[in-house]
């Protein structure tokens, strides 16, 4: 896959596809969050009157005039909300991107679709790519060209991986700590990964740290999946699968392929449960076949709460 192909896909998204039409009506900044207070701009100060919310009272300003007169702070939630794609760029993902796999195309479509939708409602968009280190960080900026620049940054990583192959797994703690130390303002954080590291190791995610971030930021996780990877097409009942790290093929039986697929589905369901109940993070599993409707339904369900 080449960068020109991705730009062409993004231009198609820009001119309107089914998913974008559904998601354009959703302002991502409207999602509710556990974060309170500092996400608002102070518009002005005036006298508090009975019937107005008690939480608006500025007690520090009212100390000298209490109880005869109380003052309130008028706050307004900013319409602009920075969006940051937190994208898994481990060796396996970069390999899939270079090969143009369905899962890789799904990732790029999601970045293009959501990114351009955010740009259309004048929200700055950025990128945080990670493996077991921070691979790239693009600060959120306004405009459609920013989304194309993000795609270009990802492809530069692909080219670097081609020239100087490195085996790097996804360590989710790395971006979480980066976010905790660097992002002072509230963001929408869109975590995109195939979650294979969690499938292989349940301890791959620090749910406590994730919960701390989710309390401050509007956070969601989009889990990439492709059931077709383990569909047996051979009449002999065997399937060839690629080792994402070595580019070698392995032949496995239909029974083993089915067992692997069931394990992946079970672990992904477990991951979604733990994300919700341990960290308060909404998530959805998206496939190349269902992502158009599933993404729109997921976002609409979040705004309805």
Tell me what each language-model feature is.
Residues 69:
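A short beta-strand signature within small-molecule sensing/ligand-binding domains used
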Residues 1-31, 37, 47-55, 61-63, ...:
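Exposed, interaction-prone extracellular/peripheral surfaces
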């Amino acid at each position: 896959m080449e960068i020109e192909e991705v730009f062409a896909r993004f231009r198609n998204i820009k001119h309107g596809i089914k998913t974008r039409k559904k998601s354009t009506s959703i302002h991502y900044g409207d999602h509710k969050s556990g974060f309170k207070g500092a996400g608002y701009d102070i518009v002005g100060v005036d006298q508090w009157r009975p019937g107005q919310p008690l939480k608006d009272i500025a007690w520090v300003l009212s100390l000298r005039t209490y109880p005869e007169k109380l003052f309130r702070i008028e706050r307004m939630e900013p319409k602009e909300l920075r969006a940051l794609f937190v994208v898994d760029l481990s060796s396996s993902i970069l390999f899939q991107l270079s090969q143009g796999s369905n899962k890789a195309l799904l990732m790029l479509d999601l970045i293009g679709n959501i990114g351009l939708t955010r740009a259309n409602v004048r929200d700055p968009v950025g990128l945080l790519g990670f493996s077991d280190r921070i691979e790239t960080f693009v600060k959120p900026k306004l405009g459609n060209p920013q989304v194309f620049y993000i795609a270009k940054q990802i492809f530069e990583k692909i080219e670097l991986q081609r020239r100087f192959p490195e085996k790097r797994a996804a360590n989710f703690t790395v971006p979480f700590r980066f976010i905790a130390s660097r992002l002072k303002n509230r963001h929408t954080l869109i975590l995109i990964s195939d979650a294979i590291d969690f499938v292989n190791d349940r301890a791959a995610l620090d749910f406590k740290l994730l919960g701390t971030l989710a309390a401050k930021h509007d956070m969601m996780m989009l889990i990439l999946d492709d059931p077709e990877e383990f569909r047996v097409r051979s009449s002999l009942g065997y399937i060839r699968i690629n080792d994402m790290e070595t580019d070698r093929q392995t032949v496995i039986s239909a029974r083993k392929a089915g067992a692997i697929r069931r394990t992946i589905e079970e672990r992904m369901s477990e991951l979604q449960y733990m994300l919700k109940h341990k960290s308060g993070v909404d998530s959805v599993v998206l496939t190349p076949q269902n992502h158009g409707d599933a993404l729109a339904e997921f976002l609409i369900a979040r705004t309805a709460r």
